[in-house]
């Protein structure tokens, strides 16, 4: 069994359901220390974070990943136990195989190989891991970035190992992500009998024109490779369940995925002004998941394009699609950020898996990226 496959299996066997780490980072730190890295464990709240560095000075290249996984769901739905890694027909199965213990293991092996071959390399190679990516993402990289800001720690380049590939390893290069902003709107009315609407105020009727305007609005036309900003209503609830009662309250949950044309405060102000214009009696609660980031043409992006093209046999698609990642907390430090990882077809699903051949190739891919950036 290869080094990367053995380490991936060891990590999968640790049931690190978010925000638990289950000893993953301790095992990784032991390996990185043996390779000559300085390791710092940053326990913030109930979350484990690991900052491992080799070398000094600029440029600083960070390999960013997470050791936590989403819950596996019912055991009986899986072909084999989610935390018992199994290889069948050239495919490794287990929770975290693709998202993202395979990438983390490949980072570690690539870093070990790189510093063994280039012990006096230029700049700093760093590995940053958290156990709070799949959950609330409060005491993970978000908090670590605050610590870095206080210390004056700079980062030039960040490669996140999120599973970015779609059909074959290296076919997609993630060069940015949209921002995410969620809102919970409560519109207040007056409950009453449906036969006496003049004695009640129906919050559904009151809110409908405002919601229609929100849904119909075109926020922008997109930005570079970003699709247009989108607002989606995700949940609507009102009423008692009886068809003869006008509800006294309406609750609406919604989410915006937005381009760099916007930031959360401006979007919040726009939506608040719209609701005020409709003279609603309402309360609105916001949750900011992260601002958008975008890496323009530069050394990191051009090197990644070349390396992925060599591995995939064709230039990668360069995309800003998908959800959010921890790179959104690193980008505001001034870092150029990309995401490169295995195929994402099975992430968060029952029988999550990664092709063994892809896993075996990942360390060489990451090592080549590191060498092109820190050696030339």
UniProtKB/Swiss-Prot annotation:
InterPro entries hit by this protein: ArgE/DapE_CS (IPR001261), Bact_exopeptidase_dim_dom (IPR036264), DapE_proteobac (IPR005941), Peptidase_M20 (IPR002933), Peptidase_M20_dimer (IPR011650), Peptidase_M20A (IPR050072)
UniProt entry tagged with the keyword Hydrolase: yes
Molecular-function GO terms, alphabetical: acetylornithine deacetylase activity; cobalt ion binding; succinyl-diaminopimelate desuccinylase activity; zinc ion binding
Record-listed Zn(2+) 2 binding positions: 99, 134, 348
Function description: Catalyzes the hydrolysis of N-succinyl-L,L-diaminopimelic acid (SDAP), forming succinate and LL-2,6-diaminopimelate (DAP), an intermediate involved in the bacterial biosynthesis of lysine and meso-diaminopimelic acid, an essential component of bacterial cell walls.
Family classification: Belongs to the peptidase M20A family. DapE subfamily.
PANTHER family (alphabetical): ACETYLORNITHINE DEACETYLASE (PTHR43808), N-ACETYL-L-CITRULLINE DEACETYLASE (PTHR43808:SF31)
Listed name of the protein: Succinyl-diaminopimelate desuccinylase
Naturally occurring in which organism (per UniProt): Xanthomonas axonopodis pv. citri (strain 306)
